[in-house]
């Protein structure tokens, strides 16, 4: 899109910059940073429009515009000690590439005894994105995942984990294409409309980009298209599903009906053009997996379930009012002979049980799972509380206890993190190019704009803070679920070499 390249958020009526997107016009200017507040917007040399208490979507419309045009922002710097300080920042609008929500990869070196490690590839996929409409320049999920698989394969990955834990869905066509990277031709999903008509969407490309061991890591937040991928790969006995006991359970398709367009004989069709359109979202179709079972409400159950706070939180489809019930249709008559195709399948004799038993043993013995269960117990106790004291003394003590507990958690995470696995990051070329451009921009000296500041603020201070921010590394997140998935994958890989799956920590 064309804009300034900043993530904005409404903070109690004030439009606040929460993130400067890499490689965008805002970063190029070197004059904006996170937590700066936008108080006014002006087009070119025109007067400023006051945007305090204005709805965020209207502010965004004012800031966006044609490529090459200038927008001026009246900024209250976030780091200014004096709240009366203002500065005027002119920015030339340009193209902004969103890379934060694209697929990413990493290679985990999992210890496997005798000073050996097993390289396990991980592809994190936040959504199913792709080209929408003519002239779209967006990349696609399948193309991006293909690029990462090739990079991980070249790096020596012996197994791949497809991380769909925070994937809420997206384009159905991309879900079908992505599944095809791991199976030869075959059904992916059945779609039935309200009249009972059924359509089978299949992968028709006989080639497979990855035929090695495959784990799909899911959670209660994995919904819609991600459930189709997980369910299809499970039905084809192609992947092992690991994560929460089941996925979200969204197996329906909705369409937004604009009432004045869809109901020509109602009074809605007489509404004037400038009036707000009346719309309704209606469920029109339902998904079914190749085996005929719906993903609605029940979701896709895990082959190996890991303990999680998500199990008792009301975040699934079955927790919503008036959710459609689960159902089933006839299964598609299809089977892949993985032995004949020489493709790794988790349904090899005794393999599934061996992997599950080894994981269960670790869940009962490892310190990180004991810590996880303690955390879940504390959160459940808090969730089950139905009454809160109105005593100020009790509330203060509660705050103190909570802070002490959170500090304890942080200390435990830090201690566990010291023994985390070695990981190497793999990015898409478009993301690498964007990061390189960002580093190049940040290495350039800041250009001062005469007369752009109202009040006292030092450009040298801004330069120093940008430099400190660029050098600051994110603290690694100790991901218990990903670690266990990598260990399960390691057991699987080693089982290909030995008659029994080993239990590696």
Residue ranges and their predicted role:
Residues 288-290, 294-501:
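Conserved functional hotspot residues or short segments at active or partner-binding sites
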Residues 206-208, 263-268, 327-334:
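A general structural signal for short secondary-structure boundary/capping elements
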Residues 225, 237, 242-244, 248-317:
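Polar, glycine-rich mid-to-C-terminal structural blocks
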Residues 7, 11-14, 18-20, 151, ...:
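Mixed-charge, polar/low-complexity N-terminal
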Residues 3, 7-34, 39-265, 286, ...:
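Cleft-lining beta-strand/loop regions that shape enzyme active-site pockets
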Residues 503-505:
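Short, solvent-exposed mixed-charge patches
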Residues 2, 85-87, 119, 276-283, ...:
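A generic structural signal for well-ordered coil/turn residues at beta-strand boundaries
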């Amino acid at each position: 899109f064309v804009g300034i390249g900043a993530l904005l958020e409404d903070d109690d009526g004030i439009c606040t910059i929460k993130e400067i997107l890499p490689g965008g016009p805002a970063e190029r200017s070197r004059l904006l940073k996170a937590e700066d507040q936008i108080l006014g917007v002006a087009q070119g040399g025109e007067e400023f429009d006051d945007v305090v208490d204005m709805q965020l979507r209207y502010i965004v419309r004012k800031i966006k515009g044609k490529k090459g045009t200038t927008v001026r922002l009246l900024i209250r710097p976030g780091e200014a000690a004096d709240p009366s300080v203002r500065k005027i920042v002119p920015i030339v609008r340009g193209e902004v590439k969103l890379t934060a929500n694209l697929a990413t990869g990493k290679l985990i070196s999992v210890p496997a005894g005798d000073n050996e490690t097993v390289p396990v590839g991980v592809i994190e996929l936040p959504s199913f994105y792709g080209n929408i409409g003519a002239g779209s320049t967006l990349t696609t999920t399948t193309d991006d995942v293909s690029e990462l698989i090739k990079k991980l394969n070249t790096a020596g990955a012996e197994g791949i984990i497809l991380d769909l834990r925070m994937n809420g869905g997206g384009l159905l066509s991309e879900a079908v294409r992505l599944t095809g990277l791991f199976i030869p031709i075959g059904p992916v999903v059945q779609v039935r409309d309200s009249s009972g008509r059924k359509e089978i969407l299949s992968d028709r490309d006989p080639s497979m980009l990855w035929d090695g061991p495959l784990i799909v890591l899911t959670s209660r937040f994995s919904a819609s298209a991600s459930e189709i991928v997980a369910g299809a790969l499970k039905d084809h006995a192609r992947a092992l599903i690991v994560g929460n006991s089941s996925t979200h359970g969204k197996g329906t398709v909705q369409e937004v009906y604009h009432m004045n367009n869809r109901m020509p004989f109602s009074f809605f069709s007489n509404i004037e053009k400038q009036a707000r359109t009346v719309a309704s979202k209606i469920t029109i179709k339902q998904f079914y997996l190749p085996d005929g079972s719906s993903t609605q409400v029940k979701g896709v159950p895990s082959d190996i379930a890991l303990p999680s706070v998500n199990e008792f939180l009301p975040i699934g489809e079955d927790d919503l009012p008036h959710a459609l019930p689960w159902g089933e249709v006839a299964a598609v008559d299809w089977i892949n002979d993985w032995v004949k195709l020489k493709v790794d399948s988790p349904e090899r004799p005794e393999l599934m049980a061996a992997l599950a038993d080894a994981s269960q043993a670790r869940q009962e013995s490892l310190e990180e799972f004991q810590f996880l269960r303690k955390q879940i117990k504390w959160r459940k106790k808090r969730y089950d509380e139905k009454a809160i004291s109105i005593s100020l003394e009790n509330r203060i003590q509660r705050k103190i206890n909570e802070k002490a507990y959170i500090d304890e958690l942080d200390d435990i995470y830090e201690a566990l993190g010291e023994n985390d696995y070695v990981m190497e990051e793999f990015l898409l070329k478009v993301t690498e190019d964007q990061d390189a451009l960002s580093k190049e921009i940040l290495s350039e000296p800041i250009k001062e704009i005469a007369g752009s500041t109202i009040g006292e603020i030092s450009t040298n201070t801004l330069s120093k803070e940008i430099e400190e921010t660029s050098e600051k590394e994110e603290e690694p997140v100790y991901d218990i679920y990903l670690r266990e998935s990598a260990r399960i994958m390691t057991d699987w890989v080693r089982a290909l070499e030995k008659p029994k799956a080993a239990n590696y920590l």
